Regions:
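Non-catalytic structural scaffold of enzyme domains
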Residues: 1-269
Length: 269
C-alpha cells in the first residue's frame, strides 16, 4: 500500500496547482495519478447532484488505478461532494477548502476575508463555515468569478481579457476593504499575477494548494503510508476526458516540463 499512488482529481487543468504543490511537499518516491474531467469542465455551474455524480465517477476511476489516498483538487467538489466521497471510498480523502480556510485565518490582519470561487462554491457557504470554525469574528465576503475558469483552461492568464475580467469581478471586493483574498478555485492561481495586480499589494492572496499538500503529507505519515523511495515522479500519470493536446500544452507550460504520460479516457464507460 505504501507504494501505491495518490489520486488527484479536478474538473480540468486547475488541479495542477495542487499537483505541483504535492510534488514539492511530498517525498520524491510518491507517485501521483491525476484526473482532469476536461469533457465536463466547469463543475461550478452544475447542480449539486450532478457534481456529486461526477465526483463519484472520477473517484471510482482513480480507485481502480490502485491509489492509497484521494486529493480532491477542486473547490466545487470539496464544497458539495466530500461527504459522499468519504462514504463511498475507503481511503483518506482530502479536500482543499479546510486547508485554505485555515491558511486565510492565519494571515488576515483585520479579519475581513474575501473568497472568490465558482458559483457552486460560493453558494455552498463552505468557506464561510470553515473560516468561522477557526475565526468566528471574521467577516467573510464571497464573490463568484465563473469566467476565470475558461480563461485558465485556455491559457489566457495574463492578457487584456484577463485583466478586464479581474477588474469587473474584484472591484466590489476592493471597496469592501478586505485584507485577505482566498483563491477559492484551483484554477485561479493560474491567474494570480492578474488578480494580485488588481487587488494591490495590501491584500494577501491565499492559495490552498500548499496548505492542502501539507495536510496530505500529514495524513499519510499518520497512517504509515508515506513512501520512502527515491524516485516516483517519473511514474506520474495524467488522465483527461477530452482535449488532451490542449491540456498537454497548458499543463507543460505551468509545470515547467513535458507531461510524459498523458491519456484521454472515458470515466463514464
Amino acid at each position: 500500500m505504501v507504494d501505491a499512488g495518490i489520486g488527484v482529481f479536478d474538473s480540468g487543468i486547475g488541479g495542477l496547482t495542487v499537483f505541483k504543490a504535492l510534488r514539492h511537499e511530498l517525498p520524491p518516491g510518491e507517485r501521483l495519478v491525476y484526473l482532469g474531467d476536461t469533457a465536463r469542465v466547469p463543475y461550478g455551474t452544475k447542480s449539486e447532484d450532478t457534481v456529486v455524480r461526477y465526483a463519484l465517477e472520477g473517484a471510482q476511476f482513480l480507485q481502480k488505478r490502485g491509489i492509497k489516498a484521494l486529493v480532491i483538487a477542486c473547490n466545487t467538489m470539496s464544497a458539495v461532494a466530500l461527504p459522499a466521497l468519504r462514504q463511498a471510498i475507503p481511503l483518506p480523502v482530502v479536500g482543499v477548502i479546510g486547508p485554505g480556510a485555515e491558511a486565510a485565518c492565519r494571515v488576515t490582519r483585520r479579519q475581513v476575508i474575501g473568497v472568490i470561487g465558482t458559483a457552486a462554491t460560493i453558494r455552498s457557504g463552505a468557506y464561510a463555515s470553515a473560516i468561522a470554525h477557526h475565526l468566528p469574528e471574521a467577516r467573510v465576503i464571497g464573490r463568484a468569478c465563473p469566467l476565470f475558469v475558461p480563461l485558465a483552461e485556455e491559457g489566457w492568464v495574463d492578457n487584456e481579457v484577463a485583466r478586464a475580467t479581474a477588474e469587473a469581478y474584484l472591484g466590489d471586493l476592493k471597496r469592501e476593504g478586505i485584507d485577505t483574498l482566498v483563491l477559492g478555485c484551483t484554477h485561479y492561481p493560474l491567474l494570480q499575477r492578474v488578480i494580485g495586480a488588481t487587488m494591490g499589494q495590501d491584500v494577501a492572496l491565499v492559495d490552498s494548494a500548499r496548505a492542502t499538500a501539507l495536510v496530505v503529507r500529514a495524513r499519510l505519515e499518520e497512517r504509515g503510508l508515506l513512501s520512502g523511495g527515491a524516485t516516483g515522479g517519473d511514474d506520474d500519470h495524467f488522465f483527461v476526458t477530452d482535449s488532451s493536446e490542449r491540456f498537454r500544452e497548458v499543463g507543460s507550460r505551468f509545470l515547467g516540463g513535458p507531461l510524459a504520460r498523458l491519456e484521454q479516457i472515458d470515466i463514464t464507460a
